[in-house]
Design a protein with these regions (language model features):
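Helix-loop boundary and gating motifs at the non-cytosolic
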Residues: 2-57, 207-246
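Hydrophobic core of transmembrane alpha-helices in multi-pass small-molecule transporters
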Residues: 17, 86, 97-122, 295-309
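Glycine-rich segments within core transmembrane alpha-helices of 12-TM secondary carriers
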Residues: 141-162, 337-345
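Central cavity-lining transmembrane alpha-helices of secondary-active solute carriers
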Residues: 47-64, 247-259
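Symmetry-related core transmembrane helices of the 12-TM Major Facilitator Superfamily/SLC fold
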Residues: 169-186, 361-378
């Protein structure tokens, strides 16, 4: 039994690695392809990211339902094939009429740092549901930490690999790499706790995570998709150098995530999020004001790490508080709320940056993150309250 679980985790991990390498390459190449090769402005790339975010939200929502009703394995295979298909489409096209749909099915929403699953697409909630089913309840944070670490490191390597190829060729290379991880998913052994479309028993918990996820997505959409374009438009950083910065940022974020289990042990769910994301928020608010490249690079490298450090704790906490046959829908609904809000932020930032108001998205980001952290405290409370609520939830689920 243990060997079977280890094999399944290895298969899932390999798929995660291939997707992350491809995502890391696309994360660097896509802004340069739109801004420098096709010569469109920040507003256009903002609209593409908005469209991609909406598409990812729609795919994610229906994937979450399919995961619970149809099954995890089949849904995961179909969703995993979307990224290589989208990369092939972009490679063979220079028209926005085909690039936008490709970005939508590939999830080029760039709503997270590389370590946090940027360009994850609709596959993210399904992968999380499968991993939660394979991992022991008490070790889920550790498993989520390791997988997020693995994703971040390989995405950072992918960002560095982007130096080796022409901007357009990166999409074909990414398609080949991401496709390599799809066939093995057929051999996954996943416990299928299939639910029915109906009333959610843990809707209150899902609602709280959905609201905090929505604000988190709005804040992400404001700045994360435009960090690389910011360096392109303000500092005129070449792709070869930007890929090194992206590699360093992704690598640091990945190693920071390994500290999540210890962070959870000493600070608990809420304080871990408030401390790490609070510090990161302050850094991003001052980021556009300094206009000094070394400091900007420093914040670009450590800021995303602080933002995603507590991510495995949040993922684990959500899966602990909902029924197994509602997990796919819970993760899907959470992603829909996050990405729908993110598309609003991305559209606004694209307009502001296109009119040279580079600082405004970061200021708005600070206000929204402050509200988000307040809601985490209000909804989930102190460490003592967390433990009491967890016991309550476990009793209800049993």
């Amino acid at each position: 039994m243990k060997n079977s679980i280890n094999r399944d985790i290895t298969v899932l991990g390999f798929s995660r690695v291939t997707r992350s390498i491809a995502a890391g390459m696309i994360n660097v190449a896509f802004p340069y392809y739109i801004l420098m090769t096709l010569h469109y402005g920040a507003f256009v790339i903002g609209l593409i990211y908005v469209s991609a975010t909406v598409g990812t939200a729609i795919f994610g929502f229906f994937s979450g339902i399919a995961t619970d009703v149809w099954g995890k394995r089949g849904t995961l295979i179909i969703a995993s094939a979307l990224l290589p298909v989208s990369a092939v489409i972009v490679y063979f096209s220079s028209s926005l009429w085909t690039i936008v749909p490709a970005a939508m099915i590939g999830g080029y929403s760039a709503t997270g740092s590389l370590a946090g699953g940027g360009i994850g697409g609709a596959v993210q909630p399904i992968q999380s549901a499968v991993l939660a089913g394979l991992a022991p309840h008490e070790k889920r944070t550790r498993y989520f930490s390791f997988f997020t670490f693995l994703s971040g490191v390989t995405a950072a390597i992918g960002a560095l690999f982007s130096k080796l190829f022409d901007v357009r060729d990166i999409f074909m290379v990414s398609a080949i790499i991401s496709a390599a991880g799809v066939p093995g998913l057929w051999y996954l052994h996943v416990a299928e706790a299939r639910g029915k479309i109906g009333k959610l028993k843990t809707k209150s918990t899902i609602g709280k995570f959905t609201l905090t996820g929505m604000l988190n997505g709005l804040s992400q959409g404001l700045i994360v998709p435009f960090l690389i374009p910011f360096f392109v438009l303000v500092y005129h950083v070449p792709k070869s150098l930007m890929s090194e910065y992206a590699f360093a940022s992704g690598l640091l974020g990945s190693f920071a995530i390994l500290g999540a289990p210890m962070l959870e042990k000493y600070f608990g769910f809420v304080k871990s999020i408030v401390v790490t994301r609070g510090i990161g928020t302050v850094l991003f608010v001052v980021f556009p004001l300094l206009r000094f490249l070394p400091v900007a690079v420093f914040i670009y490298i450590i800021g995303p790490a602080l933002r995603v450090m507590a991510l495995p704790i949040q993922q684990s906490e959500l899966t602990k508080r909902v029924d197994n046959d509602e997990m796919g829908r819970a993760l899907g609904i959470n992603q829909v709320a996050r990405l729908a809000a993110s598309s609003t932020g991305t559209g606004l930032s694209g307009y502001l940056m296109d009119t040279a108001l580079f600082e405004m998205p970061f200021f708005i980001y600070g206000v929204i993150m402050a509200a988000n952290l307040y809601l985490y405290i209000k909804f989930f409370g102190t460490r003592k309250e967390e433990l009491e609520e967890e016991i309550e939830v476990e009793t209800e689920v049993k």
